[in-house]
Amino acid sequence: MQMKKLLPMLIGLSLAAFSTMSQAENLLQVYQQARLSNPELRRSAADRDAAFEKINEARSPLLPQLGLGADYTYSNGFRDQNGLDSNSTSASLQLTQTLFDMSKWRALTLQEKSAGIQDVTFQTDQQTLILNTATAYFNVLSAIDALSYTQAQKQAIYRQLDQTTQRFNVGLVAITDVQNARSQYDTVLADEVTARNNLDNAVEQLRQVTGNYYPELASLNVDRFQTDKPQPVNALLKEAESRNLSLLQARLSQDLAREQIRLAQDGHLPTLDLTASSSVSDTSYSGSRTSGAQGSAYDDSNIGQNKVGLSFSLPLYQGGLVNSQVKQAQYNFVGASEQLETAHRSVVQTVRSSYNNVNASISSINAYKQSVVSAQSSLDATEAGYSVGTRTIVDVLDATTTLYNAKQQLSSARYNYLINQLRIKSALGTLNEQDLLALNGALGKPVATTPEAVAPSTPEQDARVQNSAPDSNGDGNGNSNGNGLLNAALPR
């Protein structure tokens, strides 16, 4: 009876899980999954947590040190003429408190700064994961578009090949027109193989970042897609000066190197510790004793003792150890300072390059939009000219290739713009999850990510093209039915 009640519930949960898995993932969801499963980010988080935990380790020598000791000794005097056996027990409690030791305080400061650097490193890795996830996501969408346009180009050339074959069969065109069309069709077939492979690789790259395969992803909604000019480059540089994480990490590393010089110099300073202890001991004897020994050194004893004291130490000369350590730390500081300058130059270059890339992407989008319109008009005019004999099939094929190349370039320019926008935010040090949420507004309907779903294979069509070449005598025997390559009209 219970199984009958549980069965509908289990079925419902299974269907709900399947429904959830079957929904297309958007960019924000993909990143959230990557954030939970990406091993590099989790390793960075563990390193950060370990660095902060190490602060407690560095603080511990400054806190009271309390220790308990105990000892038991049994002695047998088997060759002693007195034949004495003894049992000794002792216990002690020791307390040590550092009163002055600048090197220990400096070590604590160093570890706090090291933990701060590790925290910045973790933030950098977070931004890197955001950028890598978005780049991999848009690379998949770009590869999908490229394969879709290649497939559409193949079908367009297939229609042109069919029409040219029909015109050849009735003697309107020469065989060279058919051969040119077939050559172009074969070229597109090779392009399709490359496009399929690129899509497979892009999907695999996304899997590497997130740990998951996605049968569907939310595609770019071209109607909602908009471009925005970035801020003036000087304003971006000013913001990057204060917020760029690589620059911040380099500054913290320089500060850490400066603190290490002070730590080395502290090797000349004295140390002062407070010590306190309490101990008890008990000794008992057994066995025969000489009369002279009776009541002397062999009496049982029970002793207790308390001690309080100060321990002072001042290093006078250590063979030049401290001076050498100071010089090493100074050299390390010079290296850290040069690394800061390197980071500063790199940030300036990254910000300017990102700024230029965003502007170039915007210009490319506008140019390719017009290019698509012009290419479509050119193709329409060329096809009309070919119909009346003023243009050749080569002109038509070239115009077709130009159109679909322009469409692919426009698609790539859109994705490059989105990626460059994220890169400029990363250069500023402001890239976060909210930026992905904003990009989600430009996404729309789901699209399949498998090559076969994007562009179904057409083996029969490809075989028909290969097996239907007209003979060079122009008698039309190359096509068995004289109706061209198509059994049914393809949609335009």
Which residues does each PLM region occupy?
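Transmembrane beta-strands of outer-membrane beta-barrel pores
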Residues: 72-76, 99, 278-284, 314-316, ...
